C-alpha cells in the first residue's frame, strides 16, 4: 500500500515546526519509559534521515518498503523518504518470514526497513534506522513525567498490517498538529493508553472491534443478574447507574478524556460501545 500526498505532509510538518517548535509532537514508550519528540526534533530527524537515505543511494526513483508497528521511527523514516522524492510502501507486519520475502520479491522495492527481522535479501537493500539517523543522545528524548490532562493527544496502537493506516495516521497527525502517542507493544497497549488518557483514537475497524471484545469480556456473563443490570442501565440513557458504568469502562480503557474517534467514510456495523461513546461525544 502506497503512502500518498508527500508534499502536503511535508508542508504541514514545516508549518508546525515553525508555529509550535517546542510542543511535543510524538510520544513512545520504550523499556517502560516515555520518550518525546518536539516538532522541531521531528523536522531535524527527518532531515538527518533524508541525508542518510541519500547516502544509501535512495533517490526520486527509489521505493522504500516499511513493515512494523506504528511508532516514531517508522513515521520519521516514511517522511524522510517522501522528502527525498521517493515512494513509500507498507507491508503487513504480521506476515510469516517466507510470506514477507515473497511480498518483497513481488514488489521489488529498492530499499526496505523491516522491524524485528534482520535477513539479508539480495534483491533489495536493507536499511538500519540507527545508522541512517546517526549519533543521538537518547536522554534528550526521555520524558520522565508529564500531565496528560492538560493537552490534546492522539493515540494509535496499530502497525503496517492496517492497510492504508500509515496514510491515515500521518494525515490526522499532521493536519491537526496534536501530539501523537504509541504504546510500547500491543500487549501493553491498554496499560500505556491508560497512562496517556488520549483525546483521540486513530484505530482500524479491526482494532475497534478488538476493544469491543475486551469490554464484553469484562462484563458479567450473559444470563446473570449482574449482566441484566448492565443491559438495563445501557437501555436507560438517563439513569445514574448507566453513567457510573460508562465512566468505569472509560477509565479502565484509558478513555476518560476521549473526544474523537477516527473512522473511514464508509463503515460497516459499529460496535455498541463505539456507538455509545460517539453519542456522548456529540
Which ranges hold each PLM region?
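Conserved AMP-binding/adenylate-forming core of the ANL superfamily
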Residues: 26-57, 69-71, 138
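A short N-terminal helical cap/helix-turn-helix that marks the beginning
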Residues: 4-26, 44
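Short helix-loop-beta connector
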Residues: 58-63, 148-151, 256-257
Amino acid at each position: 500500500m502506497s503512502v500518498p500526498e508527500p508534499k502536503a505532509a511535508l508542508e504541514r510538518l514545516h508549518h508546525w515546526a515553525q508555529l509550535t517548535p517546542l510542543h511535543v509532537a510524538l510520544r513512545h514508550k520504550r523499556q517502560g519509559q516515555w520518550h518525546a519528540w518536539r516538532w522541531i526534533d521531528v523536522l531535524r530527524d527527518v532531515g538527518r534521515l533524508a541525508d542518510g537515505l541519500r547516502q544509501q543511494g535512495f533517490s526520486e526513483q527509489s521505493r522504500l518498503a516499511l513493515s512494523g508497528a506504528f511508532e516514531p521511527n517508522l513515521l520519521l523514516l516514511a517522511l524522510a523518504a517522501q522528502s527525498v522524492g521517493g515512494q513509500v510502501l507498507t507491508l503487513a507486519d504480521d506476515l510469516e518470514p517466507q510470506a514477507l520475502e515473497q511480498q518483497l520479491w513481488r514488489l521489488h522495492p529498492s530499499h526496505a526497513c523491516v522491524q524485528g527481522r534482520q535477513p539479508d535479501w539480495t534483491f533489495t537493500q536493507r536499511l538500519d534506522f540507527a545508522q541512517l539517523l546517526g549519533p543521538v543522545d537518547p536522554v534528550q528524548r526521555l520524558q520522565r513525567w508529564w500531565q496528560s490532562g492538560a493537552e490534546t493527544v492522539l493515540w494509535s496502537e496499530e502497525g503496517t498490517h492496517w492497510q492504508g493506516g500509515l496514510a491515515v495516521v500521518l494525515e490526522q497527525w499532521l493536519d491537526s498538529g496534536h501530539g501523537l502517542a504509541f504504546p510500547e507493544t500491543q500487549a501493553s497497549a491498554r496499560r500505556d493508553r491508560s497512562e496517556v488518557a488520549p483525546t483521540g483514537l486513530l484505530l482500524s475497524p479491526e482494532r475497534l472491534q478488538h476493544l469491543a471484545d475486551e469490554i464484553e469480556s469484562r462484563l458479567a456473563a450473559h444470563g446473570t443478574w449482574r449482566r441484566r443490570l448492565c443491559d438495563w442501565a445501557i437501555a436507560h440513557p438517563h439513569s445514574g447507574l448507566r453513567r457510573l458504568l460508562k465512566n468505569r469502562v472509560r477509565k479502565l480503557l484509558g478513555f476518560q478524556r476521549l473526544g474523537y474517534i477516527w473512522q473511514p467514510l464508509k463503515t460497516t456495523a459499529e460496535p455498541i460501545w463505539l456507538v455509545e461513546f460517539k453519542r456522548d461525544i456529540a
